[in-house]
């Protein structure tokens, strides 16, 4: 178990920082490492965050990563890193198909987890992961950054102000053209536009009008155009809520879009120019 869990007062009194480890050493791991280093150097965060360890399947790659960013420890085994009692929080930075298995491994080893989006490849995996988090009493959450931006509060305030009237429909679209990437087209890696960028469109809808506001989904209809490999290149999901509100999310890796979100009420509408 992380030495910090249940000991917040003690940690603050003794100056014990959160030791963060990164599982994986790919491009998104580099982005997180850069952020962690900046936080550790920033007086607003330096008293509680410490970039501690990285693990990759190739020990040499992990060592090079640790040297580049100044991490204390490098592991050539994910399991060995998860077994390190100095690790408080593990950021899972591998392809989607590995997220559930690796997060569950870390939770069972006593580590809190921050899982890169998409959280898991499917709902069954998400339920299994969250069940283990509940059993262990540890944190398991998704690293979907739009949920933590100030714009979320602004949107909530607007929706609840009544200025738009009763919200009747929402549309969200996020598409980036990207070709020749195995992680996008390979079904074995849980590829596809939905898990790669579509989660942002669905997340926008949920934040703007969905479960965060007490609504329940009454019906879901989805359609997609696949790559030759079978995973979705472009997709659209239509959500009907219990109060009749209709929401549409579209995402693609085959084309580009304006990345906008539109919230429509019977008194007016609001446009978010970039939901990501």
Report each predicted region and the residues it spans.
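Predominantly a Rossmann-like dinucleotide-binding segment in NAD(P)-dependent oxidoreductases
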Residues: 146-220
